[in-house]
Every structure is written in C-alpha cells, then in structure tokens.
C-alpha cells in the first residue's frame, strides 16, 4: 500500500511573473529515497524550500503527513538547502552541541554518534574554519540528521565531497532509508543519484516529471 509522506498538489510559484514552479503534482512515499534531477535554475531549490515551509506558494498546496505546510511554522524536517553556516572558531562538536542546547533534545553521545555517521569523528575537535568545503558539508548533514527527523530534504548534498565522501554519504542515505526515513534529494548531477534513489523526477523550467 502506498504511504504518501509528502504530497505536492498543483503547486505553482512565480517571481515577478516568471514561473519558478508550474502546476507541480508529485507524491513522495514514506521510507524511500526520491531524487530530483535538473540543471541550476530549473526550480529544484524553490520546490524544496516550499516543501520545508521556507517559501510560500503562489497557488496550490503541499501536504506532509496529510497536513498543509504552513510557511515559517516549525517542521520536523532535517534540511540542507544552502551552504551550511557554522561558527568558525568553534569545533564541529561544539557547533552541534550549541545547536542542540537551543532545543535541549539530544546529548553528548548523540552528537558523537552523528559525527561518526558522517565520518567527522576524527575532526570533531577541530575548528570549523579549518574544515574543507566537503567537511562543512558533512557537518551540515550531521546537523540535519541529529534529531532523527522522519523527513530529510537535501539540496546538492554531495557538493564539495570527494569520491570517498560521496560513497560515504550514499551508504549513510541507504542506512537512513533502512531506518524508515523519507529522503528528498535534489542534484544537477545525474551521477549523484544514479543507483541511489527509489524514484527519480526531472525538473525543467519549473515542470516536474517522473523519469
């Protein structure tokens, strides 16, 4: 039985009469990895921002677990949509610890666990300003998964990663799927999603179609 986690219904978004999303309809099943492929400027990021409630649709609606997404309302979603921003003078561990303290939901062992999951445990005490782009991306993924949200939304998650890093993240995403997480993964590079995703859609000029 299909268990829809995210439903996009006739979603449109325009900026000064330019259509970024054009009547998008899509259903994303729970516990699957869903790839969205498309060139830069095709509308992928706009769609993900609307799903997360960061941006308001011009028309249509988006449902998560059957409930309409409300812009600016708290969502139980792990997100990487733009280059993660961290405090450069603090270590990777300290950055996650600070973010966790704002919500008071996870402890020391949980932070160490997610850093290990993304392969940053050897560098957890290193200042983030000394991190490479790939290491910052790993830290962003650690931040996204540390509260164990059921839905993960990743825009270009392989950005800055070397071949080893890409393979590590692919393995991590598979393990997250085994835990029942739903993952929406957007990329301009078909190689990022090849063999990784359960479903693949292509976004072109604001139009989404199943591949």
Regions inferred by a protein language model and the residue ranges of each:
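Conserved ABC transporter NBD signature motif
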Residues: 60-73
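Conserved ABC ATPase "signature" region
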Residues: 97, 106-123
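The feature captures the beta-strand-to-loop junction immediately N-terminal to the Walker
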Residues: 37-39
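Catalytic Walker B motif of ABC-type/P-loop ATPase nucleotide-binding domains
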Residues: 152-156
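Helix-to-loop junction immediately C-terminal to a conserved catalytic motif
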Residues: 52
